[in-house]
Amino acid sequence: MIRLAFRNLFQNKVRLVISVGGVALALLLILSLDAIFTGVERQVTAYIEYSGADIWVSQADVRNMHMASSSLPDSVARKVKFVPGVASVSPILYLTNNVVAGDERNLAYIIGLPENTELGGPWDISSGRSLPAEGEAIINRGVAEKSGIALGDEVEILGDEFKVTGFSEGTASLVNSVAFISMKDFEEMRGSYDTISFLLVKVSDGESPEAVAARIQTQVRDVTAQTRNDFAAQERQVIKDMSTDVITIMNLIGFLIGLAVMALTVYTSTLSRRREYGMLKALGARNTDLYLTVLAQAILSVILGFLFGLALTLLLTIVIPIFGSNLVLEVSRISLLKVGSVSLVIAAISAMLPIRQIAGLDPAMVFRGR
């Protein structure tokens, strides 16, 4: 039956392209929406993920960066440094503000970095300096291109002028970017020299970040210590909570449209072969054989459509960033598993719907030319 289904499916190339193409486009819609949401989540936590820190220490009960404020006395850095298992501690200052160039205003995480820090700085420099000195700023390359900023130009950050000395990659999302200035400049503009926002902690070799975070939480008062993974997860959860309704509705609508198109494609493709099934019955095929043939054809169509739709989605993940868009698509394993499994179920159901008509076919209609 599988061989028969395969031959029947590939017998008419035009019909094959229509059925597989319809399924592929439907699945492309579903996979693309999932990839966009996964990509946005990845972009939002990129700074945390690439900070190089094993543990993030913040003010008590502050568990994320987005729309949050953390303030710690600088003495906390010395206390954390003496916790067993801590190899190094790097303080940073943080605020959400605009990078202003002419009439262009770009929302950004403004990060104040200590001199020669090994943690928390830009991880991918396309041109210029890798760390800002006093009076300097490193901004995202895409933001710079959109605003017409070149190396050596000045931008306004936190109400002061900074010379752009470096462009970073991977530090922009659909909603904001990350800009880096020196901690000294940050302190002077804020008018405070004895507080920090976050501590980025590197653990000693052989130490567990979870165990060291627990020690910091126990031994240092009024702080929250989280591993990098936990801190990133909290950041993603905040974004999800803020956009849950919109994203859920978009995903649901796209998913339902995609499944409806796929179900209709499989259904009409199955009915279009009624004459062929009638001929099989005339030649002595049992209804069970027809059922298996129909099901096999539907599943083959969906598998081919899924592979084609996945290829198109992966192509989009490469092409879209090339055109300078801050939109990043990322296909996740969970998305592939969800879409693939549901697609097979829908394919089976869609193929079963016309089976009653196929089972009731009169073999004589083949010879009557109907």
Stretches found by the model and what they are:
Residues 28-108, 127, 214-218, 224:
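Hydrophobic, regular-secondary-structure patches
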Residues 1-28, 41, 46, 295:
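N-terminal Sec/SRP start-transfer signal
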Residues 36, 215-260, 269-274, 279-280, ...:
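Peri-transmembrane interface segments
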Residues 92-95, 103-114, 124-185, 192:
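Hydrophobic secondary-structure segments that place a key small or acidic residue at a functional site
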Residues 9, 279-288, 361, 370:
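Short helix-to-coil transition segments within interhelical loops
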Residues 331, 335-370:
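C-terminal membrane-exit region of the final transmembrane helix in multipass inner-membrane proteins
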Residues 83, 156, 160-163, 167-249, ...:
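Mechanotransmission and gating elements of multispan inner-membrane complexes involved in transport
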Residues 254, 275-321, 338-346, 354:
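Transmembrane alpha-helical interface segments in multi-pass membrane proteins
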